[in-house]
Amino acid sequence: MAAETASGYIQHHLQNLTFGRLPNGDWGFAHTAEQAKEMGFWAFHVDTLGWSVLLGVVFLFIFRLAAKKATSGQPGGLQNFVEVMVEFVDTSVKDTFHGRNPLIAPLALTVFVWIFLLNLIDLVPVDYLPMLAAKITGDEHLFFRAVATTDPNATLGLSISVFALIVFYSIKVKGIGGFLGELTLHPFSSKNIVVQILLIPVNFLLEFVTLIAKPVSLALRLFGNMYAGELIFILIAVMFGSGMFLLSALGVALNWAWAVFHILIITLQAFIFMMLTIVYLSMAHEDNH
C-alpha cells in the first residue's frame, strides 16, 4: 500500500472510502483522512454501503436459489445448509419470542445471515481487497475498508432499524397511551395522584435511558468486537512487512490462530445481535410492562 510507515499503514487501513463535499465546494472522494473528516455528517462511506448491498444481494440469491431447487426427495448440499439455518433461527424465535407475529422469524433470519456475511469478510487477508480496489481504480492511495461492521455507521444503521421496529410494535400492540404509560408510570408508582405526577419525570428519565440503551448497545457491541478483530489482523499484517524472518514467521502463525478464533467471534456476534433483536421485539409485544 501507499503508506510507508507502520502507523501510516494502520491508519490507511482504518479509513473508509468517503464521498462528500470537498473544501472547494465540489463533491468527490476524500484523498486524505483530514478531507474525509472535513466532509462532516453528510459524507458517505461508499465501501460500507457497497459491501452491505452486495452481501445483502448474495444472501437473497443463495436463499432464492435454494428455494427454487427445493425437492421432496434427496436434498442437495445448498438446500441442507439453508434448511439448517432456517430451522435454527425458527427454533430460536419460538423459544424466545412470546408474541404472535409472522414477520419476526424472517427478520431474525435476515439479521443473522446478513451480519454473518458482513463479518465473514474480515477473514480475507487485510491487503487483498484494498489492493484489488486500488488496481481497478488506478489509485494506489485509495482508501478501502471491506468489513462494513467495523464502521459504526453501519452498525448504528442496523440497530436504529431495530429500534424503529421496537417503537412501532410497542405502539401497535399497547397503543400510544400504553407506550407512554410504560415510559412515565414505571418503575416507580404511587396511589397518591400528586406523588405519581411528581414521579413522572423520574420514571421517564429512567425508562428513556433504558429504551435508548437498546440500539446503542446493539451497535457498539457489534462494532467494538469487529473493529478490535480487524485491528488485530492489521497489526499481524504489520509483522509480515517488518522484513525480519522471525517476526514474519510469527505473523503467519498468529494470523492462522486468530483467523480460526475469529470464526467464533464472527458467528457469535451475528447470533447475539439476532437474539437481542428477538428479545427486544418480544418485550415490545408484551401487554404488561
Swiss-Prot record:
Q: What is its main location?
A: membrane
Gene name? atpB
Topology within the bilayer: Multi-pass membrane protein
Report what the protein is called: ATP synthase subunit a
Source species: Pseudomonas aeruginosa (strain ATCC 15692 / DSM 22644 / CIP 104116 / JCM 14847 / LMG 12228 / 1C / PRS 101 / PAO1)
Subunit details for this protein? Answer: F-type ATPases have 2 components, CF(1) - the catalytic core - and CF(0) - the membrane proton channel. CF(1) has five subunits: alpha(3), beta(3), gamma(1), delta(1), epsilon(1). CF(0) has three main subunits: a(1), b(2) and c(9-12). The alpha and beta chains form an alternating ring which encloses part of the gamma chain. CF(1) is attached to CF(0) by a central stalk formed by the gamma and epsilon chains, while a peripheral stalk is formed by the delta and b chains.
Taxonomy, top ranks, is: Bacteria, Pseudomonadati, Pseudomonadota, Gammaproteobacteria, Pseudomonadales
PROSITE patterns membership? ATPASE_A (PS00449)
The subcellular location is: Cell inner membrane
Q: Which InterPro entries match?
A: ATP_syn_F0_a_bact/chloroplast, ATP_synth_F0_asu, ATP_synth_F0_asu_AS, F0_ATP_A_sf
Gene Ontology cellular component annotations, sorted alphabetically: plasma membrane; proton-transporting ATP synthase complex
Q: Where are the transmembrane segments?
A: 43-63, 104-124, 160-180, 193-213, 232-252, 259-279
Keywords annotated in UniProt: ATP synthesis, Cell inner membrane, Cell membrane, CF(0), Hydrogen ion transport, Ion transport, Membrane, Transmembrane, Transmembrane helix, Transport
The record's section on Pfam families has: ATP-synt_A (PF00119)
Q: What does this protein do?
A: Key component of the proton channel; it plays a direct role in the translocation of protons across the membrane.
BP terms from Gene Ontology = proton motive force-driven plasma membrane ATP synthesis
Keyword Ribonucleoprotein carried by entry: no
According to its UniProt record, which protein family does this protein belong to? Belongs to the ATPase A chain family.
Which Gene Ontology MF annotations are present? proton-transporting ATP synthase activity, rotational mechanism
CDD domains associated with the record: ATP-synt_Fo_a_6 (cd00310)
